[in-house]
């Protein structure tokens, strides 16, 4: 059996979105890559699986996001056999009730507590409580199942191009699955975590710290037990390491941003003479130009987001979480349970 798997589209609309063929780019590129995944599945006689996080803002779906995404989902279900795994951005819970736009798209969706079996493949939806995910795994027959697709974090995996790891599960939790692929959504960095565990990754960068990723969707062949990466289409980031004397043609850069949809990351040393001009460029093209102030001997820095302007290498996320829990009066023995929930939310 063959399966095309795409994950973490995070279709959204932002105030600074550039237009591509009359469509905001944060809608255009993820839906374009979904469309291409559908076509690839058809060409290869494969089933299409969308492994969660179709949208970015789960509490309210912008009408334009819904319309374009629903059109592509209609195209998918009318073209190939299509299934969806619910991700943490695809639903919200209120008074113990789960609400999701995915209930209305006319495609089978694996929600927590309702796994879907397709031939030799099992789909398991996301849940905040890892015990609920475990329950869905308990009834899987590993003798006949060659592929499991789900949406959660692993401690051994990279969430992005950083050393931050905060998953609720470990590779050891799936040690019995030696002859079964586990393909996951949730972390945006495409990666092989072990011999049989992979993250698809997002098809286009969702945050600036994903700028060096080779984005993709994948083809899984459970007869040959192989995985093939198919590159996706998205605007690229250009990282420029400035020194004291670097000369920049700002008009050329502006033209590149507007006409070629390029994004720029400037690493600015303390002694750079035109720092003000670069900062002004960042203000003019907020969301497309990112700056980072680098000390002369600064190494191993990881830029994660223009708005936060912090580095994961400098911040121990777990220590911040533990400090917050301590101040909130949470017993130390319960820290990990709360940290797992926090990591799912962020």
Regions found by a protein language model. Name each.
Residues 1-17:
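Acidic, histidine-bearing metal-coordination/catalytic regions of metal-dependent phosphoesterases
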Residues 5-7, 48-53, 81-88, 109-113, ...:
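Active-site neighborhood of phospho(di)ester-bond hydrolases with catalytic His/Asp-centered motifs
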Residues 10-13, 56-59, 85-95, 114-117, ...:
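Active-site environment of divalent metal-dependent phosphoester hydrolases
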Residues 19-115, 175-176:
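Core catalytic region of metal-dependent phosphoesterases/phosphodiesterases
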Residues 32, 222-346:
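Accessory, non-catalytic peripheral segments of nucleic-acid enzymes
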Residues 43-47, 144-145, 261:
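Short acidic/histidine-rich motifs immediately flanking catalytic phosphotransfer sites
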Residues 69, 75, 90-172, 203:
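Conserved catalytic scaffold of divalent metal-dependent phosphoesterases
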Residues 161-224:
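Conserved beta-sheet core of the metallophosphoesterase superfamily
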């Amino acid at each position: 059996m063959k399966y095309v798997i795409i994950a973490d589209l995070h279709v959204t609309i932002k105030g600074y979105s550039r237009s591509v063929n009359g469509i905001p780019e944060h809608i255009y590129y993820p839906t374009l890559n979904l469309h291409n995944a559908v076509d690839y599945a058809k060409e290869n006689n494969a089933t299409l699986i969308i492994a969660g996080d179709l949208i970015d803002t789960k509490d309210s779906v912008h009408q334009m996001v819904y319309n374009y995404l629903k059109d592509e989902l209609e195209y998918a279900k009318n073209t190939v056999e299509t299934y969806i795994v619910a991700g943490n951005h695809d639903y919200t819970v209120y008074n113990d009730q789960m609400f999701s736009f995915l209930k209305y798209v006319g495609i089978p969706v694996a929600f927590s507590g309702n796994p879907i079996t397709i031939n030799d493949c099992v789909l398991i939806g996301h849940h905040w409580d890892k015990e609920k995910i475990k329950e869905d795994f308990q009834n899987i027959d590993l003798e006949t199942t060659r592929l499991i697709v789900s949406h959660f974090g692993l401690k051994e995996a990279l969430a992005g191009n950083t050393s931050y790891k905060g998953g609720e599960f470990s590779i050891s939790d799936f040690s019995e699955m030696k002859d079964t692929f586990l393909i996951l959504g949730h972390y945006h960095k495409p990666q092989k975590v072990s011999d049989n565990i992979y993250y698809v990754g997002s098809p286009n960068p969702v945050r600036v710290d994903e700028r060096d990723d080779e984005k993709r969707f994948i083809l899984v062949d459970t007869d040959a037990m192989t995985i093939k990466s198919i590159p996706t289409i998205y605007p690229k980031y250009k990282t420029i390491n400035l020194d004291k004397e670097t000369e920049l043609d700002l008009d050329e850069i502006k033209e590149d941003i507007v006409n070629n949809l390029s994004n720029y990351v400037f690493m600015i040393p303390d002694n750079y003479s035109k720092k003000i001009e670069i900062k002004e460029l960042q203000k003019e093209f907020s969301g497309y130009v990112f700056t980072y102030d680098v000390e002369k001997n600064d190494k191993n820095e990881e830029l994660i987001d223009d708005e936060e302007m912090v580095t994961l290498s400098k911040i121990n996320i777990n220590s911040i979480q533990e400090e917050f829990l301590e101040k909130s009066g949470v017993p130390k023995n319960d820290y990990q349970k709360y940290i797992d929930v926090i990591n799912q939310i962020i």
